[in-house]
């Protein structure tokens, strides 16, 4: 979907303008419009006649789902009719992870079961991929909504750095370890919802890597992997729960260290690692960080 039109009332027009301003859209003059704005390759124009909004660009579908519906119209129906996208609303597990690319902190993997009723509820609540949510408070608020949804099933595992490093020494490959984690979560969800026929995850490796991990746990269901899997509501909900567990650990680690433990693998991360080692010795690093990262060598001069 690269174009969409929807009617708005006066209050929704005002609300949409405020939302666009908050998201950093650039407003431009355009004939016959109340206002017109653009950001990247997305254009949003509200026309006087109607009034109605015209959304154009490759991010049209995301804008409808993550901005227009939850923040402006309050109706989760635009472009998501169940007839047009039955798999989105059919019973399935969605799996996602958080912390994979961060030197500090755990690898958190979460799974969520959804069906048609649950999916409609989550869309209306504004559930979206955690990477689109900018604050920890918002992540926690959305996570609470997910957990309180009637009929939902979910599971989250957090591989704290000590356990992560132990497992990595065994697997010696991040994708195989991720597959084991995904399979572990799917196994628990299958215990809760044994009739669920399908699981969906973001594609992080060849399909056979995860299929092999599932076979080792005697799990038989249809597995789908795709890029941008988080566009699926179940996967998006899983991303929120995984992120919540990750930021909770990072907050606790910051308190324990006595200074901010940063995200990512930046120079600030290296500085924080050196500060930890200076205060507590190099052996403490394995309690805070993923030691196979090249960042370890930058911190200690050695690659574990």
PLM features: residue spans?
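RNase H-like, Mg2+-dependent phosphodiesterase core
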Residues: 1-304
């Amino acid at each position: 979907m690269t174009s969409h039109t929807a009617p708005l009332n006066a209050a929704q027009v005002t609300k949409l303008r405020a939302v666009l301003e908050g998201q950093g859209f650039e407003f431009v003059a355009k004939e016959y419009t109340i206002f017109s704005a653009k950001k990247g390759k997305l254009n949003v124009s509200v026309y006087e006649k109607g009034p109605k909004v015209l959304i154009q660009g490759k991010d049209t579908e995301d804008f409808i789902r993550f901005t227009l519906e939850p923040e402006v119209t309050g109706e989760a129906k635009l472009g998501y009719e169940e007839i047009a996208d039955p798999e989105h609303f059919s019973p399935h597990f969605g799996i996602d992870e958080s912390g994979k690319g961060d030197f500090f902190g755990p690898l958190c993997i979460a799974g969520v079961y959804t069906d048609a009723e649950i999916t409609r509820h989550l869309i209306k609540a504004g559930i979206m991929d955690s990477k689109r949510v900018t604050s920890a408070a918002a992540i926690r608020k959305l996570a609470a909504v997910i957990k309180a949804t009637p009929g939902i099933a979910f599971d989250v595992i957090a591989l704290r750095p000590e356990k992560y490093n132990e497992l990595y020494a065994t697997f010696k490959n991040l994708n195989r370890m991720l597959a084991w984690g995904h399979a572990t979560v799917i196994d628990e969800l299958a215990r809760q919802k044994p009739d669920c026929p399908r699981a969906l995850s973001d594609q992080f490796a060849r399909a056979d890597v995860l299929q092999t991990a599932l076979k080792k746990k005697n799990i038989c269901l249809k597995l789908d992997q795709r890029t941008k899997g988080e566009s699926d509501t179940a996967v998006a909900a899983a991303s929120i729960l995984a992120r919540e567990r990750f930021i909770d650990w990072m907050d606790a680690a910051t308190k324990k260290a006595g200074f901010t433990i940063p995200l990512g693998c930046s120079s600030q991360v290296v500085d924080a690692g050196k500060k930890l080692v200076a205060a507590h010795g190099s052996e403490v690093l394995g309690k805070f960080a993923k030691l196979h990262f090249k960042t370890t060598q930058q911190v200690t001069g050695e690659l574990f």
